């Protein structure tokens, strides 16, 4: 009986290791033309971290889910240097994800620097970033709209570009 339990345990561990190995995230680039690259991701992490160059021309980045609501985001992907990274959320629990990037050349630095991650460090390490006044964890904000008191809490609403430090990709969000 001990032999059977040992064999079953060995099989279970072997299966577990195989399962962990086969669910590893993988990113592959398919450069369809000089201005269109498709990023295929198997077993996506929470984010794809996009390398940003402040002075680069904007590229159009689209998480392609096949839904009518899919929208291009204008993002300054790194051409020759990486100034910082921004997280681009991937679908939770999906087996695969597709990201289409238009208007970024095949030789751009971003293709070597792009990475997958389940986390994004938002520690305040910037010398001039305020501690007392509200700022988003990353990105650009504008048009703070006063405090709104609702359900016993104050909310501050503002416009937000999560993909860079310049105007664009307007999202509305709030903090409590």
Which residues are covered by each model-predicted region?
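Beta-rich carbohydrate-recognition and catalytic domains
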Residues: 21-176
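Bacterial Sec-dependent N-terminal signal peptides
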Residues: 1-26
């Amino acid at each position: 009986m001990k032999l059977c339990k040992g064999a079953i345990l060995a099989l279970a561990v072997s299966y577990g290791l195989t399962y962990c190995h086969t669910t590893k995230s993988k990113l592959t680039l398919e450069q369809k033309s000089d201005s269109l690259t498709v990023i295929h991701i198997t077993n996506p992490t929470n984010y794809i971290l996009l390398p940003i160059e402040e002075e680069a021309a904007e590229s159009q980045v689209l998480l392609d889910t096949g839904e009518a609501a899919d929208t291009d985001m204008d993002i300054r992907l790194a051409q020759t240097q990486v100034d910082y990274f921004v997280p681009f959320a991937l679908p939770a629990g999906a087996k695969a994800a597709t990201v289409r990037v238009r208007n970024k050349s095949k030789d751009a630095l971003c293709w070597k620097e792009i990475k997958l991650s389940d986390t994004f460090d938002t520690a305040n390490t910037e010398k001039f970033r305020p501690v007392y006044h509200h700022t988003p964890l990353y990105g650009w904000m504008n048009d703070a709209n006063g405090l709104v008191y609702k359900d016993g809490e104050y909310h501050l609403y503002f416009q937000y570009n999560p993909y860079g430090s310049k105007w664009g990709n307007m999202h509305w969000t709030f903090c409590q």
